[in-house]
Regions:
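Metallocofactor- and cofactor-centric catalytic cores in central/energy metabolism, strongly enriched
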Residues: 1-411, 418-501
Length: 501
């Protein structure tokens, strides 16, 4: 990584560099001048590029020049594009980072009878269908006001509602995905108890979620149609929650190994520095966790498109085939809906300097660190192996994170370059800024600033260790910025696949 005061060249083979600060036309870059004003995070050409020449960043192709580009010229959507045929699988020649030793390898969590461990002790109120959503919110409001003050060991009553559960087939991809999500939340170790509320006539019947495990005494269901109406349903629910929460309030934190942590990794509102600072640092934190027996989940299949070789080359044959299968499904799914995977970067991504899906994907995959990929799972499928794993999901953060939590994540780490107002329940979320400007402008949202990596003030390894230590703090009960604000009730967004009937 070559770094000057104003630009950063990430790999010796790169023919573009990243602006660390706004560059003004005429500024000297050491042998050539800036051709026009270039925003921070955007790319400048290091040498002349003819039409059709590969543009290389991270040592990997990110697209091709669509016009002649002079040294020092801004490289972005006006002169760089990507075609599907540009995807190829070069050897990953990145040097392995030496991982720092963590100072702590234990945390204090809630041990559940099924062997999993919670980092929080919420009581969940899950809607089986959108028709019960308002009642679920009313139940939670009453429970938090009337029951919670007398319950010292419960973090709160959480209403988790969604916009489907009826008007759908009772089989197929969409229904199975919803079942996995709600069953995953029903059994989640961060819930000390759960109440599932339905209307009564929906496709997604509450009887599908009968207790099947240690929650027998801590799970109950309720159909509004079996009461006198909404107000009566709330009253009945409070009686049920009184019993559930009394049992959950007996739960206490005990010392547990970090191998009991499952980390869901997310990125959203990414910029060009995300793949240089925050994502690689999170990758180090993930490697430390995996090295101590824990589990990390990488997701967002549309955002690994073009960089999948970096994952497949370190997985076994079965896992590699699963990832290729996910991508094949997504190509067909996108085409059926008039979309393409190569048009993924959002307007915010582009304003932050990301031009093509290859460039975005190469940065996103950096969250995976350097651990072997041990398995791949369907959306919201229960994670049953340790190590670095992959879970299929959309790139839309709330949907992806909902699937990760359903799969068993008891912590979420979320990197951002443009800014994010995300938070999840019942899993606490740590937000990591890719640049110091964001950390300074949105201090109410950011838990860790990875910006100093870009200037060489700190190493990726040391920042990764800091992220790992902060995750341990969260696992012990310390609140993240998103928890302080109260995020999570409205960020529960199960993936909706298929037609609404």
């Amino acid at each position: 990584m070559n770094c000057s005061q104003s630009i950063l060249r990430l790999h010796p083979n790169d023919n573009v560099a990243v602006a660390l600060a706004p560059l003004h036309a005429g500024a000297d870059l050491g042998g050539y001048a800036v051709g026009s004003d270039v925003p921070a995070g955007h790319k400048v050409a290091c040498n002349a590029l003819e039409i059709g020449v590969p543009v290389v960043k991270f040592g990997q192709l990110i697209g091709r020049a669509t016009q002649r580009i002079h040294p020092g010229e801004h490289v972005h959507a006006h002169n760089l594009s990507f075609e599907t045929g540009d995807i190829f699988a070069p050897v990953d020649d990145r040097k392995a980072l030496a991982l720092p030793e963590p100072t702590r390898t234990v945390f204090r969590g809630y041990v559940r009878p099924d062997g999993r461990v919670g980092t929080r002790n919420f009581v969940g109120i899950l809607a089986s269908v959108n028709c019960s959503a308002s009642v679920c919110h009313a139940i939670a409001a009453r429970a938090n006001a009337e029951l919670l003050p007398g319950l010292q060991n419960i973090d709160g009553f959480v209403p988790l509602v969604h916009d489907h559960g009826c008007g759908m087939q009772s089989s197929g991809e969409g229904f199975e995905a919803l079942l996995r999500v709600l069953k995953g939340y029903r059994d989640h170790p961060n819930f000390g108890g759960v109440l599932i509320v339905g209307l009564g006539c929906e496709v997604n019947q509450v009887t599908l979620y009968k207790p099947t495990n240690w929650r027998d005494a801590r799970l109950s269901t309720l159909n509004i149609q079996e009461t006198s109406g909404s107000a009566s349903a709330v009253a009945v629910a409070l009686g049920k929650l009184s019993l559930i929460s009394k049992a959950a309030n007996e739960d206490m934190r005990t010392e547990c190994p970090v191998s009991k942590l499952t980390l869901g990794m997310q990125c959203g509102g990414s910029d060009a520095l995300s793949g240089i600072t925050a994502n690689p640092a999170l990758g180090v934190a993930s490697d430390i966790l995996v090295g101590n027996g824990g589990t990390s989940i990488l997701s967002e299949t549309p955002e690994i498109f073009g960089a999948q070789h970096l994952l497949i080359h370190r997985s076994n044959a079965m896992t590699g085939r699963k990832i290729e299968g996910f991508l094949h499904w997504w190509k067909n799914y996108a085409a059926k809906n008039g979309a393409t995977l190569d048009n993924n970067p959002s307007p915010g991504n582009k304003r932050g300097g990301l031009t093509t899906i290859l460039e975005k994907s190469l940065g996103a995959v950096a969250k995976a660190g350097q651990s072997p990929l041990t398995n791949a799972y369907a959306y919201a499928e229960r994670i049953d192996t340790s190590g670095l794993v992959y879970m299929d999901s959309p790139g839309y953060d709330p949907v992806a994170a909902t699937g990760q939590v359903a799969a068993g994540a008891n912590l979420i780490a979320f990197t951002t370059g443009r800014g994010s107002c995300f938070g999840a329940k019942p899993a606490p979320s740590l937000k990591i800024a890719s640049n110091g400007g964001l950390a300074q402008s949105m201090p109410e949202e950011i838990d860790v600033d990875a910006g100093p990596i870009a200037t060489g003030a700190v190493s990726i390894a040391s920042k990764g260790l800091e992220i790992f230590e902060r995750l341990i703090d969260l696992a012990n009960g310390e609140k993240s910025k998103s928890e302080m604000f109260g995020y999570g009730d409205l960020e529960f967004v199960p993936w909706k696949i298929g037609a609404t009937l």
